[in-house]
Each structure stands twice: as structure tokens, then as C-alpha cells.
Amino acid sequence: QEDDRSSPRYWLFDRENNRLGDFLVVWPEIEETDLSQTKPFKFTNSDGVTLHGYFTEANNFTGEKPPLIVLPHGGPIGPRDFWGFDPDVQILSNAGYSVMKINYRGSGGYGRDFLKAGMGEPGRLIQKDIIEATEGIIEKGWVDKNRVGIYGASFGGYSAVQAPILRPDLFKVGVSLVGLFDLNMDFREGGCQA
């Protein structure tokens, strides 16, 4: 069992006694903690492509509008973000940041054409999707447009460096964890073109 505000929980069915009971709660200590709800959203970019993402409002924020952290997933081709519990998102939210995750072109689960649309486009169309989705969240008035950062790992780490280069007016900070920076190697070995 998993939702967006409780840690993963696994159940065990006892056939002899016909009972269902807890087998494992991954982070039982956070069950009572006030966590933030993650809401799905849709956005149509300037190319007319519908993108899906997830927005988590800042928890415990006092002020006019919270800052935003954009959290692009790795890949880029095939992986995707899902609705559900994400410890990174909850940590950021409880620190007072709203968080946006976007399934850019090339993300899995949206059909072959959507997947292919991201192939060979790690520095262009995929970054365009991330940037335009960020602008879309700002236009909704949910966050402070002057306090936007981006943080990611693997290909998300590449995006966390690329976005502030492409749009320094929009992204005030970028944090890259194990970022993918040798795109030529990744093309040769399969990651970017999948």
C-alpha cells in the first residue's frame, strides 16, 4: 500500500488464519508526521504537446508564496515520474519548498510517439518542456517566481545544470547529484537514445 502521504507499507496474508497483517512499513516513524499532498496536473507546451506532472505544495510555509524546486527525473528516455510517496519531495516540502515534477517528452507511459519525441533531444526539447512547465506553474500563481530552483540526479542532474544556463532569469539555483554530462558517451551506450 502506498499513497502520496504515507510511506510504503507491505502486507502479509496468513492463509491458515485467513488474516491480513502488516509485514513491513518502510518508514514507520513518519506515519504520524504531517506530510504534503501531491496533485497531478496537465500542461500544454508551446508545441501543443500535453505534458503531465505532479505538484506538491510547501508544508509549514508562512508567507505570501513559497519558493519552487523543480525535480526532473532521470533517464531521459523511458523513466517517468509517478504519483505516490516520494521522500525527497516530502523533505523539500517540509522545509518550506513547493515541488514540481514533470514527465517531459521521452518519458515512459505515454505511448511510442511521446517516447520517440524525446530521443536525441536532451539539451533542447526536453529542457524546453521542463522550462515551460515551470513557467506554467508560476503563471498559476502557486509559487514565488523570483525563488525557483532545480534539483536532480542522473539526467535530472544534467537538467539541473542546463536549466539555469538556458534561463538564468528563471532558475536562481541548480543542484546536480551524479549528473550525466558526457552526452556523447551516453548516446553511444544507449541512455539518451534508448
Predicted region positions:
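Serine-hydrolase catalytic core recognition
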Residues: Q1-A194
